[in-house]
Design a protein with these regions (language model features):
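Polybasic, glycine- and aromatic-enriched phosphate-binding surface used to engage nucleic acids
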Residues: 1-202, 209
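Non-catalytic DNA-recognition/assembly elements of restriction-modification systems
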Residues: 1-5, 71, 194-261
Length: 261
C-alpha cells in the first residue's frame, strides 16, 4: 500500500488516543518488516506492536465517515492545503484521505522481507492485515492451499538451500544489506514435498523461538535436518550451502562491518 504520507496516515497508539480516532476508520497494517517476528502474523501479534506504540493502524475514512466523525476531520485537516495539493500520490486517489482504496486495499497471503541483513523471511498472514510498500505482498496462486502448507513453505525458505538461493538472486548494497526485488523474490528456490509438510509445520513454535533469539544457524540446521531425513537433500550439500551463505554474506559486508551469523 502506498499512502503518500506514512507518517501521517499510519498511526500509533498515542496519536489514536490523542485524537480519539474511532476504530471504524482504522485498518491494521504492517509498516515495517522489522515489526514482524516468527513465520506468522495475526491480530494477537499485531496488538503487541500497537501496545509498543509503534505505527500499526492505517487511517482511511470514506466520505461518510469523514463527515460523521469530528475527531477524524480535525486530524485529516491538520495537513495544510499546500501539503495536500502538492502530494502527487494524493491526487491519484478518488479521495486523497482514503489510502485504503482499490488495489492498495488487497490483503496479501504473506509478507516477504525487502531490505535485509541476513536472509529473507516469509511471514504468513493469518488475519486481515495489510502492509506498506516497504514490505513485499505475497499471494499464493493455489487459493486452496492449506494453512499448514503455507507455514511449511515459510519454514523451508529458512533452509541453507533457499537462503543461498536468495543471496545469489538478491542485490547487495554498499551498506551491506541484501535487497530482494519482486522478480528476485519469485526466483528464490524453495524445496517442498508432501512428505515434509507435517515435519516442517511441527517446527513452527521452535523456529519462532529461535528467530526471537536470532539463532539463524540453528534454524538452518533444524530445517536442513528435516530435508535430509526425508531424502530431499544430502547433508554434504547442506554443508556446502552453509559455507556459501557465510562467504557471500561476508563479502557483501566487506568494508562496512564484520559479518557475524
Amino acid at each position: 500500500l502506498v499512502s503518500g504520507a506514512n507518517s501521517f496516515f499510519i498511526l500509533n497508539k498515542d496519536t489514536i488516543n490523542k485524537y480519539a480516532i474511532p476504530s471504524k476508520v482504522l485498518y491494521p497494517i504492517v509498516a515495517r518488516f522489522s515489526y514482524l517476528n516468527g513465520v506468522r502474523h495475526n491480530q494477537i501479534k499485531h496488538k503487541k506492536i500497537f501496545e509498543r506504540n509503534d505505527r500499526s493502524y492505517l487511517l482511511s475514512p470514506n466520505d461518510e465517515q469523514l463527515s460523521c466523525y469530528e475527531s477524524v476531520r480535525e486530524y485529516i485537516y491538520s495537513l495544510s492545503s499546500n501539503e495536500i495539493s502538492e502530494n502527487k500520490t494524493f491526487q491519484k486517489r478518488p479521495n486523497w484521505f482514503e489510502p485504503n482504496h482499490g488495489i492498495d486495499s488487497v490483503i496479501p497471503d504473506a509478507f516477504l522481507s525487502y531490505m535485509i541483513h541476513r536472509g529473507p523471511r516469509l511471514v504468513i498472514n493469518q488475519s486481515n492485515i495489510n502492509c506498506t510498500n516497504s514490505v513485499h505482498k505475497v499471494f499464493f496462486r493455489d487459493k486452496s492451499i492449506s494453512h499448514k502448507n503455507k507455514i511449511a513453505i515459510s519454514i523451508s525458505l529458512l533452509s541453507s538451500y533457499s537462503q543461498l538461493s536468495a543471496e545469489i538472486v538478491g542485490r547487495a548494497y554498499s551498506s551491506g544489506v541484501l535487497k530482494i526485488e519482486p522478480t528476485a523474490g519469485k526466483s528464490i528456490n524453495i524445496l517442498m514435498d508432501e512428505k515434509i509438510i507435517d515435519p516442517l509445520y511441527s517446527l513452527t513454535n521452535k523456529i519462532e523461538e529461535l528467530l526471537d533469539k536470532e539463532e539463524h544457524k540453528e534454524i538452518r540446521k533444524l530445517v536442513d535436518n528435516v530435508l535430509i531425513a526425508n531424502g530431499i537433500i544430502k547433508e554434504s550439500d547442506c554443508e556446502k550451502f552453509s559455507l556459501g551463505i557465510d562467504q557471500l554474506r561476508s563479502e557483501r559486508y566487506k568494508g562496512v562491518k564484520k559479518y557475524h551469523e
